[in-house]
Amino acid sequence: MRWVTWASSLLAFLLYYNTMDAGFVYDDRRAILTNPDVTGHTPAEALFQNDFWGTPLADDGSHGSYRPLCVATYRLNYALSGLRPWSYHFLNVLLHCTATALVAITAKKLLPRACSRVGTAVTALTFAAHPIHTEAVAAIVGRADLAACNLFLLSFLVYNEHLRLRDISGKMKGNCLYRSDDFVRARSLSTGDQNFRLSCHGLVQQIFSNFRKLLKAGKMGPLRLISGDGLGYAVKTEGSSKGSESSVSVSEDSELLKWLSLSGALGLAGAATLCKEPAITVVPLCIVYDLLRGYRQNTVHHKNRWRSICLLSTGGVTMLYWRLRLAGAPPTFATADNPAARDPALLTRALTFAYLPIFNFYLLLFPFHLSFDWSMDAIPRITSLFDPRNIVTATFYTIVSKVAWRAIKHEFLRELSESKEIKVYKPRGSCKTKYKSNISRHPHRNLESADRRAYHAPHRDGGGKKLCPCTGCRHPVSEDHSGICRTMNNNNYMNHQSCICAVAVKAKQIKPQTVYNSSRVALLTFLAFMALPFVPASNFLFYVGFVVAERVLYLPSVGFCLLLGLGAGTMTKGWHRNELKSRMFLGSLLLCLLAMCGQTIKRNMDWRDEESLFKSALHINPPKAYGNLGSVLSAQGRTAEAEAAFRRALAHRPNMADVHYNLGILLQNQRRYEAAIKSFERAIYFRPSMALAYVNLGAALASDGRLSEAVSVLRAGTRVDGTRVRDRREHDSARVSALVQLAALHVQRSHWHKALAAYREALQIIPESEVPIVGWTRHSVLTMAGEIYAQLRHWAQAERSARQALAAAPRDAATHLAYAKLLARNASRSLEAEEWFKKALNLDPNNPEVRDQFGQFLRSQQRLSEAAEQLVAAAQLAPSNAARAAAAARALRDAQRCRSAERWYERAAVLSPEDAQSHSNLGAILHLNGKYAAAAAAYRRALQLLPGDEITLTNLKRVYTLMTNQHRT
């Protein structure tokens, strides 16, 4: 069945190949683009101190999602490819392919043998192509679900390997597995109770056994020991003495591998939890699977099974306790995120939360009604018992309960009733039939007959003894050593734990008692696979910040696909009896698969960019979709469409503060200040903690000339309480912006000391690190404060502030440039200033601002030729900047390079055709170069733009005079 694994993984890759050229959409921006843990602005240990979005877990506004391993993969992507999205999408697709392969392996191990072939194929192909996975794969933030699913399945498979090794170990120590006298000899030599009671012959045999064990381990290697092939021969009943002794060595090795695999399962479960919290449910899933798998086993295995379950439970409880303690106080979410959670009516909450799992199951069953967001009222709350959806809820839970109960009834209760009919062991004296096992009287009896009467250790009950019958032949055996036992062990005392019975061996070979023979047990396992990972998102244990999230269904969909595989395999079990029906059924499965593939490809196109994504959800969640679509259209410059989208969103839901704020930004950019002010005021009314609205409201008031009101609003914005805000970095950035704008207003009104106070307050908000607060850094604010000190002529404080900025950002060219400009104000430190200008130029040689400022400094030093070179370079680096072109032309004219200056004046006039000064300057340089006709035309154009300009009129008269004199001569 390896072809199924490879084919399904290949299908998964082909279906999601078209996501490689997608960009960062929706939640990707906050999780990656503005997350300092991803961009490397924080140390590596901060990954284990912050939540998924980069907010410290100790912060009141933390989301509470702790996924450091997932964030570490983002950081690795950033280190390898920066912010190019293709590498992020490629890793997502790769993780989906590996998850598909693991699902195929899991299906092969869990499905009943009779339906394994078709069931595995249906399970793996359905998982690869299911459209519900598009959000998890196409959205980069879905990597948490992808990585968690991979580690979840690996943990389960490793625990399954632990069960296999445990069974092998139990069978080797248990009853009725081997019949050869060679095994009895090897088994006796491996018993720890004989270490000091062996004869000389036994001691030699033990030495040889240990030596053979080392040879076998070296010959087989660790991989074959772990694989089924390496341990499989240990349970064979036929073989030579060499095989028997090897089985003993492998048994002892399997003990170590057994506990290593259990530790590995717990370790993988912990790693999965560090990718996404619902993956911790792999621990109860393994426990449920172990109980379902072991109910048919003999009592010999119970002790080992409960030991594994206890250890697994201890590890799971420890992880859960650590995670809950790490989370601290539960996060708070907005009412719009999960309206039912904030509903005051208990009945509404109960009915709605009972219905939501059915809606999620509907999305798995019919994944053609998908949305990027299901918040707000995308799914109306159930407020009455008479809502028709309650019938669906009751029907669904009734069917699931009945199916589960029938499976339990037919498997477990029947097994219990059969176990009661087993004959209880009786004291030896009460046995009606006497069985003799004196093999010494029949020395020529064949070995198999002797094995049927082998010794089994009696159970003690008080003072009496009960004989333990052979589990294979059900016959009581002798209390004393059998003839074979005495022969093999030189009449030494043996603490036997097993009898040797060929009947039992044959029974074990013919009727293996495993879970794979029961479709009902498989059904219960798959239901657990689907239900347990969904429990953390069900609102039953605690409220979550969403109504429905499609990427959360990535892990539960494994159980759903396994159920589909079980159903398909069961229906095609007798396919050879009716070939027509089987072909029709397989054809319908193929059509369903093709439909899912088509929907997946189509849905991937929706996730290509934000505009297509938001448009795809207009019919499902109109207020959210229109609001986000308006932001995208506004960023693209499509202002009319953006405004229409914002107003449609507000028509559906008028209390959305984000939409009011974004509409205000749009109106502010159009200089419609009155309308913008109203939008910002509504945003503040619906969300008083929205600091960004205060910032932009203050800016709009200042632009409208209402400076006093602007100062009051900005001061209020700096004092907004940020407790439990969704994005603490954005909130702090808004407060810093308010303080910076407040300082600018104070500077405009010449209130220098108030401006300094605002900058000092901003520095208290910004942390003393290189972590940007969404656009604001500590060194940028220190630089602005230094400029204020320079205006006040407090040179010592100005230099101290500049030095602090350099210490905070030693590789920032703008900080070096600011310090150089500060030094240039002091004529005695011009050489030192020139050194700092050169340092800034070395740090950022392609920055036109650095070259422009350096050129201005050189010009002030009367080094005109060098100044012209720097200013021309600045103009070349900013080819669309008319001011830089004009500055380069002036520097060239001062350096007596008038022909070169002419070209740059022409460039400036082309870049700013409506600027009269540009045309006047062009006329002047043409005048100097002797091109009088062209100079007159430039002067006339300048006078058209600025009639009555005296300088231009004077220059034009001079040109006319020169042209007249030239004509006369």
Segment roles from a protein language model:
Residues 1-461, 465-475, 479, 485-486, ...:
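Polytopic membrane enzymes that build or remodel cell-surface glycoconjugates and lipids
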Residues 616-623, 655, 689, 723-724, ...:
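Short coil loop/turn residues that delineate tetratricopeptide repeat
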